C-alpha cells in the first residue's frame, strides 16, 4: 500500500503495518476475517432486497439476467463475473453503493458447508437454486450430497423469505422441504412441469 494514492484510499485493512504508507491502516489478526465481518455488517444494515442464487449450472447467466431485469426498477448491484466464493462474496458487499435497492449475489461451492457460510454473510430475502447436477461432484459421493449442500442456501433466510426452485429437478421435493424448514414463507417454482409456478409455453 506504500504506492497507493491516499486521496483515493482512506484506509487499508492490514495484517502487517506498512511504515511508509500514507493512508490510514487498520491492523487486524486476519484480513480475511475482517473482510467477512465488514461485509456481514453491511448486509445487516442495507435496506436492499437481497437475492442469493446457487446451482450446479446456470448461476452466472441467471445472475446476469436478474441484474438486467432489476436495474429497470432501481439501483442494482451484483456479483462481478463469477466472484462467488469466500472472498468474492464479501467483496461484492463491500463494493455495494449505499443507494442500492436490489442486491444479487451468486454463491458457489466445492465442498459441503461453503454455501451455508456464504448465505450467513448475505442473509438473503429471496434465494434461488437453478438445478442439481454432477458439475461439482468431485468432492461429493452422490447427487443427494450436492442437493444437501445447495440447500444450505436457505439456512440463513431473512424471516419470511422466498425460495425459487427448479420444479423439474429430481430433488425438488427435497429442496422445498429444506426451504420450508428454514422458514420460507413462499415457494416459487419454474420449469416445464405443469405444476410449475412459472413455465415457458412459447418461444420465438
Region locations from a protein language model:
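Adenine nucleotide phosphate-binding catalytic loops in nucleotide-utilizing enzymes
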Residues: 143-147, 177, 184-204
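Phosphate-binding loop of NTP-binding sites
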Residues: 33-167, 173-184
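Short low-complexity, flexible loop/linker segments enriched in glycine and/or proline
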Residues: 22-28, 92-95, 204
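N-terminal leader/targeting and accessory segments in enzymes
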Residues: 1-37
Amino acid at each position: 500500500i506504500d504506492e497507493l494514492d491516499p486521496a483515493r484510499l482512506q484506509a487499508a485493512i492490514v495484517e502487517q503495518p506498512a511504515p511508509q504508507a500514507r493512508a490510514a491502516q487498520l491492523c487486524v489478526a486476519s484480513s480475511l476475517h475482517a473482510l467477512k465481518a465488514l461485509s456481514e455488517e453491511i448486509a445487516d444494515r442495507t435496506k436492499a432486497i437481497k437475492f442469493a442464487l446457487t446451482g450446479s449450472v446456470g448461476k452466472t447467466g441467471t445472475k446476469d439476467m436478474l441484474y438486467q431485469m432489476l436495474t429497470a426498477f432501481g439501483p442494482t448491484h451484483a456479483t462481478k463475473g463469477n466472484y462467488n466464493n469466500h472472498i468474492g462474496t464479501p467483496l461484492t458487499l463491500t463494493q455495494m453503493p449505499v443507494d442500492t435497492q436490489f442486491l444479487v449475489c451468486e454463491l458457489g461451492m466445492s465442498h459441503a458447508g461453503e454455501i451455508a457460510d456464504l448465505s450467513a454473510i448475505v442473509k438473503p430475502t429471496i434465494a434461488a437454486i437453478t438445478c442439481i447436477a454432477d458439475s461439482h461432484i468431485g468432492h461429493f459421493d452422490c447427487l443427494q450430497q450436492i442437493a444437501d449442500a445447495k440447500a444450505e442456501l436457505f439456512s440463513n433466510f431473512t424471516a419470511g423469505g422466498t425460495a425459487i426452485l427448479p420444479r423439474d429437478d429430481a430433488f425438488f421435493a427435497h429442496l422445498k422441504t429444506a426451504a420450508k424448514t428454514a422458514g420460507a414463507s413462499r415457494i416459487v417454482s419454474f420449469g416445464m412441469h405443469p405444476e410449475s409456478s412459472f413455465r415457458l409455453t412459447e418461444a420465438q
